[in-house]
Amino acid sequence: MQYSEIMIRYGELSTKKKNRMRFINKLKNNMEHVLSIYPDVSVKTDRDRGHVYLNGTDYHEVAESLKEIFGIQAFSPSFKVEKNVDTLVKAVQEIMTSVYKDGMTFKITAKRSDHSFELDSRALNHTLGDAVFSVLPNIKAQMKQPDINLKVEIRDEAAYISYENIRGAGGLPVGTSGKGMLMLSGGIDSPVAGYLALKRGVDIEAVHFASPPYTSPGALKKAHDLTRKLTKFGGNIQFIEVPFTEIQEEIKEKAPEAYLMTLTRRFMMRITDRIRENRNGLVIINGESLGQVASQTLESMQAINAVTATPIIRPVVTMDKLEIIDIAQKIDTFDISIQPFEDCCTIFAPDRPKTNPKIKNTEQYEKRMDVEGLVERAVAGIMVTTIQPQADSDDVDDLIDDLL
């Protein structure tokens, strides 16, 4: 028998009450985006569960995609069969014979939304249970935590049978918590921060700073590839490339070496905040982890944060590096992140950066520069690209490949 659909059980949506349908509709849109690589697959949702109709598409491929979509608590592949007792008996016997192994226990869980069906739920449980015993006489029934819980649902159009319950990604549907700007470098931490923000329903746009010729086309492609890895959790992501060469050259010329990193990060924060404002974002997200590098001490964070009143979300701030690496490997960004391309945060990194920068000092050094003009020119020069889950590359990547 071939699976015909996958039944979706929602995650935290069950707590949303009045906003429930808004969350469900967003989850439906996200599933349609991610599953768009399977042209025959269709998605339907209602208040209680979702349905992914396979229409002949390979179940295993679709299931792997569903495992990554936030807002799904669990899902079950189902067989669609004709709605009569004889057909149900034969289907249940065939399924149980194929999955049973010595010593396993089972139960039948039947329910019907079509109350015109000839048997009620209790009678159907008994009938199908007897059918299993007739082909597997040594099997034992167990009502609590059986090895096989065969679920039979009688709907208006057909009957559906399932026995697997596969854990989903949990979390909230991407986009239900508003939009945030992810400061995406080429490192290990920021893609993980983006993933964790997506899990809590934040619709992210990736802001990446490029400083050619100091940063290479390879570094830009690396950032594109990291963004594409994140699209499998909720669909398309807008990638925003910011020209940053002029600012970094200005900082290097006008400021003491020990303050280069602090000033660089303050400019990045200003620009990201300006982009957030222009694009109706609510928060800024970054991959800072407390104490990991010089710019991530509390004193440094305070000095950098001082340029904005916008909330800054740091999903990995309390994690050890190995914890972050574990997540990066899980979401398949680690191998990309360790590719040896320098980014804006490393090209002019001082040997001994200031770990406890004073805000008044940073403000004094910034008076040597046209801060507003530099920010305005950077924001005016941004390039926005849509990164899609189904594409192996895009026009910008093709151009980068030519340059490489």
From Swiss-Prot:
Assigned EC number: 2.8.1.4
Top-tier EC class: transferase
PROSITE patterns: THUMP (PS51165)
Pfam families hit by this protein: ThiI, ThiI_fer, THUMP
Keywords linked to the UniProt accession: ATP-binding, Cytoplasm, Nucleotide-binding, RNA-binding, Thiamine biosynthesis, Transferase, tRNA-binding
GO CC annotations on file: cytosol
Keyword ATP-binding: yes
Record: residues binding ATP: M183, L184, H208, F209, R265, G287, Q296
Pathways per UniProt: Cofactor biosynthesis; thiamine diphosphate biosynthesis
Domain THUMP positions: 60-165
Main subcellular localisation: cytoplasm
Single biological process term from Gene Ontology: thiazole biosynthetic process
Location relative to the cell: Cytoplasm
Keyword Flavoprotein: no
Molecular function terms, GO-annotated: ATP binding; CCA tRNA nucleotidyltransferase activity; tRNA binding; tRNA-uracil-4 sulfurtransferase activity
Reactions this protein catalyses: [ThiI sulfur-carrier protein]-S-sulfanyl-L-cysteine + a uridine in tRNA + 2 reduced [2Fe-2S]-[ferredoxin] + ATP + H(+) = [ThiI sulfur-carrier protein]-L-cysteine + a 4-thiouridine in tRNA + 2 oxidized [2Fe-2S]-[ferredoxin] + AMP + diphosphate; [ThiS sulfur-carrier protein]-C-terminal Gly-Gly-AMP + S-sulfanyl-L-cysteinyl-[cysteine desulfurase] + AH2 = [ThiS sulfur-carrier protein]-C-terminal-Gly-aminoethanethioate + L-cysteinyl-[cysteine desulfurase] + A + AMP + 2 H(+)
Entries under NCBIfam families matching the protein: tRNA uracil 4-sulfurtransferase ThiI (TIGR00342)
General function of this protein: Catalyzes the ATP-dependent transfer of a sulfur to tRNA to produce 4-thiouridine in position 8 of tRNAs, which functions as a near-UV photosensor. Also catalyzes the transfer of sulfur to the sulfur carrier protein ThiS, forming ThiS-thiocarboxylate. This is a step in the synthesis of thiazole, in the thiamine biosynthesis pathway. The sulfur is donated as persulfide by IscS.
HAMAP family (UniProt xref): ThiI
Family stated for the protein in its record: Belongs to the ThiI family.
Protein name: Probable tRNA sulfurtransferase
Gene name of the encoded protein: thiI
